[in-house]
Amino acid sequence: MAKAKAKQEPQQQRQTLQATYRFVLFFIAGSLAAFAFHALTSSTGSLMGWRLRLHHLPTAHYLQTRDEFAVYSVDELNAFKEFYDKSISDSVGASFTEAEQTNIKEAMGALRLAQEMYMAGKDDKAARLFEHALALAPKHPEVLLRYGEFLEHNQRNIVLADQYYFQALCISPSNSEALANRQRTADVVQTLDERRLISLDEKRDALSAIHEANSALRRAKKEAYFQHIYHSVGIEGNTMTLAQTRSVLETRMAVDGKSIDEHNEILGMDLAMKYINASLVQKLEITLKDILELHRRVLGHVDPIEGGEFRRNQVYVGGHVPPGPGDLAILMQRFEHWLNSEHSSSLHPVNYAALAHYKLVHIHPFVDGNGRTSRLLMNTLLMRAGYPPVIIPKQQRSKYYHFLKLANEGDIRPFVRFIADCTEKTLDLYLWATSDLPQQIPMLIQTENEGHVLAQLQPHIAQSIPELHESGSGSGSGADPIRVP
């Protein structure tokens, strides 16, 4: 009996030891599984969180950027995801064509040489090399980052530098250097933008103080009316000169050598602008019906069947693919809600008008006339806030479309600043036209004798308007400048 009990004790000890081993192994396995699960489900992403902690970067602006996505719909978020996925796939060398890979290699070489020139103090050569690298690889994060740093520290162009940092982050969200640079520039750029808007308000108030009966103001408004129509249809490819545009509007007579459609585009804009002046400017809210009525007048002479109607087919605008026709009704309802929301009305009028322009042209609800209708809506909102209708010069067509493209890629700010530029130039022209200056004041377009007109201005005036005109060829329209008595 004692022997049997002695044999059982070692056996029980072995069983107890085995049970202990199994418990320890189970505990270790469970701990590893829990750690792995926690790492995979961390809220900010393990890689990005690790990099942020490693470099001790502040995350306030990054989190603020993420919070802004809460206002977007599911469709808009999906569009952002598609753009991000495409950007990620584009960053993989295997996805590039042979020609694109060659361009990237050349861009990297130009980038290295640009940095060498910069370190050697040869800033002009460095600037040209940076621009060359950007032209070869406009979506390469390293090119965007290094060129932005050059602009920030050497050229003192912090606004453009911030724009390139933002683009680099859109393409490579975990780029720690781009994050750090953006943290440094974001507040400064926001302050500059706010100061610009305050300056616009001051000029608007100065213009509003001029009595409506002022003869110079009345002449300026009449000239600006012709200019607005001329430039808006010109952006869309209309070849009428300013003098011909004025003739069509004043005489309703045909111009030899010009198509019927070009005449009708001008007449349609005239109808739409008269509708704005007579009705929309006084309305408290802009409805979907108002937008359709505006578009119906834009196409009233060109295509009366499609005027005021949503498109029924898919369209393609360069690299942008607008929503399908089945989504237009709900998207336009959302746009109408945004247009009249309390949040939108709290925005600065220039920001509000520029955003409305972009949102409508991004949806692209019509077969034709989307750009003209969007610009008319923008000016309606500006006029309700006391601003004059803003003229976007046809000579800046490429800039206009470039900034719209940047907005499609995720950064609306360059487009808003472009609209602010056009707003300020329009305000300046009104103020100069109603001032006591005895000289001729040119309008926004370029003419063959533009250089002579500017040379006739007093030196201190000429110095105050260095960016009145875009460089490039003139329109040859022979437009009359405003003459101030």
From Swiss-Prot:
GO MF term list: AMPylase activity; ATP binding; Hsp70 protein binding; protein adenylylhydrolase activity; protein homodimerization activity
Keyword tags: ATP-binding, Hydrolase, Membrane, Nucleotide-binding, Nucleotidyltransferase, Repeat, TPR repeat, Transferase, Transmembrane, Transmembrane helix
GO cellular component: plasma membrane
TPR repeat coordinates: 107-140, 141-175
This protein's record includes keyword Manganese: no
Bilayer topology: Single-pass membrane protein
Motif (Inhibitory (S/T)XXXE(G/N) motif): 232-237
Xref: Pfam families: Fic, TPR_14
Localization (cell): Membrane
Binding site for ATP: 236, 317-320, 368-375, 400-401, 408
GO biological process terms held by the UniProt record: detection of light stimulus involved in visual perception; histamine transport; protein adenylylation; response to endoplasmic reticulum stress; visual behavior
Active site: 364
Stored SUPFAM superfamilies: Fic-like, TPR-like
Family, similarity comment: Belongs to the fic family.
Domain notes: The fido domain mediates the adenylyltransferase activity.
Subunit structure: Homodimer.
Protein name: Protein adenylyltransferase Fic
Species of the source: Drosophila virilis (Fruit fly)
